[in-house]
Amino acid sequence: MPTTVSEEIAGYQLTLETGELAKQANGAVKVQYGNTVVLVTATASKEPKDDLNFFPLTVDYEERLYAVGKIPGGFIKREGKPTEKATLTARLTDRPIRPLFPDGFRNPVHIVSTVLSVDQNCPPEIASIIGASAALSISDIPFDGPIASVKVGKVNDEIVVTPDVDEHEESQLDLVVAGTKDAIMMVEAEANELPEDEMLEAIMKAHEEIKKIITMQEQLVEQVGQKKMEVELDLPSDELVSEVEELALEDIEKVLQIKDKLEREDAMDEAKQKVVDHLLEKYNSEENEDEEEELKEKHIKSAFDSILKREMRSRIIHENSRPDGRGQKEIRPVTCDVDLLPNTHGSGLFTRGQTQVLNVCTLGALGDVQILDGLDIEESKRYMHHYNFPPYSVGEAGFMKGPGRREIGHGALAERALKPMIPTEKDFPYTIRLVSEVLESNGSTSMGSVCASSLSLMDAGVPIEKAVSGIAMGLIKEGDQLAILSDIQGIEDFLGDMDFKVAGTEDGITALQMDIKISGTTREILKQALKQGKDGYLHILNIMKQTISEPREELSPLAPRVIKKQIDPDKIRNVIGPGGKMINKIIDETGVKIDIEPDGLIYISSSDAEQAEQAIKAIDELIKEPEVGEVYLGKVVRTEKYGAFVEILPGKEGLVHISELAEDRVGKTEDVAKVGDEILVKIINIDERGRINLSRKQALGEEDGKTNNDDKKSTKKT
């Protein structure tokens, strides 16, 4: 018998149901929001993975195209690898729940969100987050939830929770917030230059709705919640931590005074290994088993890291001393460069401390858009950003492979940051691809990608509205004391309480991503972080403007030129031709790319201006309307007893009656006009059905012999 709880949230009915589907999972909840239905399951292994030093959580978001009544495109008619949207939603589900598992929990946990039905007004990614929390909360898996999530927009200066499709199109904000009853855990936002106070207001409004959904989950737990399993947490003992502290504290204090990342990491590894060797030798002398020694080594390293974290945080809070010697608001040295690569359309290099990103911009025809075969209404996108993070960027030897979840996520964040500034298709009819190559990494390569992308776009001559920059912020909180750090580096990100990335222009925020690992993050803390973040990215923006302050007036000479031509929508079929015959002929003969919009707007893309002009002339011929009295050099395509059919324009034929072939009487059509001959003809009549009547004898009587298709060359004098 299923158990359900239901409540109206932002105008749509939200129902959580368990007990009917997927009953062998540790926890399973069917979430229905409006007509969106997502089944979320949570399973956990009974035994821990002893060889791991991290929590093995896997989140999979499974899109099913039947959810929107579609059959997958392509040769194989089933879903393949996850789409980019599915990967991003899996990350969105993972991020707010991961901090709520116990430290030292090493049992593999698997969350699977399967999308069964999609109502475009009620986003399935929100149902996935709610379902993951609910499934974990009612299961026997240790979890310090529940959490919930909502999507928020801003339409006509009003904050709207769960905006519908039409409102989403008009919204100045696309915000996803997740949190517990007491605190915000995650924020993901794209905005059209939203002020910080309005962003904060939207986050707080979202939290009010989140509390209602958490109450629903608590009701479900009261009815069907299981007793949590007893697990042994894989943590070093207090005695071991004390022993490691005694051996390592002095070295850790020295390590934290080293400003260079690589030098500091080498010293840290050396100090850690010294403690490991000392303690393993001690335990070896006590004749411990090998397996216990390996386990102990992991615990020794964990104890060392906990002391390192404590000492670094203490130095920041009490001494205002960061690992590289900067103040809390101080940003590392920034340098910028553009036009680095000779054969690309645009390039930008952004370096901030030991983080360096090269971005390359490529422009293409509208036909180069990325086709999307997913659950959203959007079927293609003309602006995309790809992010690559090779092992050498952190000084490691590794394997080069396809983009992982992290790379897809970082690329999407940088893409969102610049999206509000990208010109519309009408104003700039190009496909835009940006690729960020991370060359060095020591904190916030995603925000480095935003800055490098902005430089690259302006170098390519893309008329972006304004330049965009970004910065990563951090938070260290100990009791009532806190430090908000600008431009965090890798070690501060790893050991801090908040990862907070913000991008924007001089006039407001364009993207925001926040992950908070602790409770008690107040409105005032978020307000201070947003203000300090804006100060930081504006500082970087001013440095970028010293290199290039606005888009170049001309596109790169290597970029294709796009010419727009408006025609009557009723003439589109003339340009395309039967089975695409006419348009493909133009493309084959001129080498251009042609894209046609339903409203009759044609885009001709070519790197060769002469070829583009040839294509335009060919299109003009296809859409030209013949008029009575005009003379053409036509081609005989068919002969009958009563006359000859002559093509005067591509796809347009007329009849020369046998009596109109010559002044003298003609006994047989072929005596004057054979198939393939080119002859002069004049339009003498177009009847009410559009049929064209031609005359050869009247055309021959024209004095100047000028035709309306002079560019055609005759193969036979007539």
Curated annotation (Swiss-Prot):
Main location: cytoplasm
Residues bound to Mg(2+): 493, 499
Gene Ontology CC annotations of this record: cytosol
Stretches with biased composition (Basic and acidic residues): 699-718
Gene3D superfamilies, sorted: GHMP Kinase, N-terminal domain, K Homology domain, type 1, Nucleic acid-binding proteins
Subcellular location per the Swiss-Prot or TrEMBL entry: Cytoplasm
Homology family: Belongs to the polyribonucleotide nucleotidyltransferase family.
Entry protein name: Polyribonucleotide nucleotidyltransferase
Native species: Natranaerobius thermophilus (strain ATCC BAA-1301 / DSM 18059 / JW/NM-WN-LF)
